[in-house]
């Protein structure tokens, strides 16, 4: 065993050890702050009910979502969006029909909530040649709203393609002009990543700061947003402490020191998928799974021999501890930690929902390991897959189907065996999100992974397929991400076979990947830099209150 030649990825150690995580403390879980938040929510409800103009309503909905407090006011939001939808569809008189901002904001919010609204509502802003009118260039607020709305497009919607190109071009031009700093910051933030591609909770510190600088800022909404953020942060800290205690008991960080120790970064994935308080179980499940996936991925990618990997894959596929004796010691530790964690979590699930998820959970772990083994065989044989062949495996090895199928189990009240089995085919609701996660991951990690000697990723596969250079290929992959979002908008957002909670979580999976790998770096694997800033902002540092 000791004489076996093994590769090393030289991963940096975690900067979030158990001692530090257990020391996290927040006063915002105290009863006085919870009572204050309830009082503020009642005052906001009164404010919302006093609002009469449809445009004021949709702007309030937008603000509530950006400030990540919309989950407190779902009844109000649902009622008012239905009213706006009825106005647009029935052709009833609306005083804002010529208002680009009002029309595009309504379109975006309605589509975001699953309403099927035609892009024809934008015809009023186009000339006889089918182009957007040039006089719209000076309407910066309208341009920003048009830009954000254009990312709700689906395949074949040429009006929306034109809207996106038009708005992007003119917003970039506006940035070069001498303009108000707050407005310039808002444009730059939008051009960096559109709102539809962001998770509101992961972006909320920026949104709160931006809202506070607005001239039309409502102090009541701002106060609630800050307090709600701090209360949620207190809850997230408690969850991380619980996760850290679990992780310490597994002894995986010290026993498998060659692998990534990324508990906190894994928790960010769970937080991004489902940030609301009532989705705690989902967050914890995703965090535990992602932590274990990172370790197992490193076993297959870097440390394990091909013979060992075949034995480990077989043990996971059989889901039986009698195969433990066949494994080397480091794999025994990993397999038993996986086996116990999944079974304990499934026991809690059985008590809560009366449903045995072990067969479905173990299936996804086996599927993941079998795919890792295929990719390991590619590496050891020197095989170079085409981009399509790579993505067919890569959508599984990035663990999208694993995370989304478990999220479905958590978010579905009345579980049916048939529906869960249907998910095993990785239908579009899972496929497109997983492909997007794979592409975003590869943009951020492929350079470092190739230095370690890992398999070629999507960038290298496309370069090998086409002869393009890396810069051209990165541009191609970014365009592929855009076209994949069109599929997500149709096959996930508008797929009414699934609950809105699950559809939102699925899209959040795509969004978190772009958050983690936003700057073409590895926000999951590299603990310093942007990753550290994000953890501090979301989980460690509260927003100062007066």
UniProtKB/Swiss-Prot annotation:
Motif (DDXXD motif): 297-301
GO biological process: (+)-epi-alpha-bisabolol biosynthetic process; diterpenoid biosynthetic process; farnesyl diphosphate catabolic process
Cofactor: Mg(2+)
Binding site for Mg(2+) 1: 297, 301
Keywords annotated in UniProt: Lyase, Magnesium, Metal-binding
GO MF annotation, one: magnesium ion binding
Disulfide partners: none
CDD domains: Terpene_cyclase_plant_C1
Binding, Mg(2+) 3: 441, 445, 449
Cofactor notes: Binds 3 Mg(2+) ions per subunit.
Catalytic activity: (2E,6E)-farnesyl diphosphate + H2O = (+)-epi-alpha-bisabolol + diphosphate
Pathway per the UniProt entry: Secondary metabolite biosynthesis; terpenoid biosynthesis
Domain of life: Eukaryota
EC number(s) stated in the UniProt entry for this protein: 4.2.3.138
Top EC class of this enzyme: lyase
Family of the protein in this entry: Belongs to the terpene synthase family.
Comment field on protein domains: The Asp-Asp-Xaa-Xaa-Asp/Glu (DDXXD/E) motif is important for the catalytic activity, presumably through binding to Mg(2+).
Function field: Sesquiterpene synthase involved in the biosynthesis of (+)-epi-alpha-bisabolol, a precursor of the natural sweetner hernandulcin.
Protein name: (+)-epi-alpha-bisabolol synthase
Organism from which the protein derives: Phyla dulcis
Lineage of the organism: Eukaryota, Viridiplantae, Streptophyta, Embryophyta, Tracheophyta
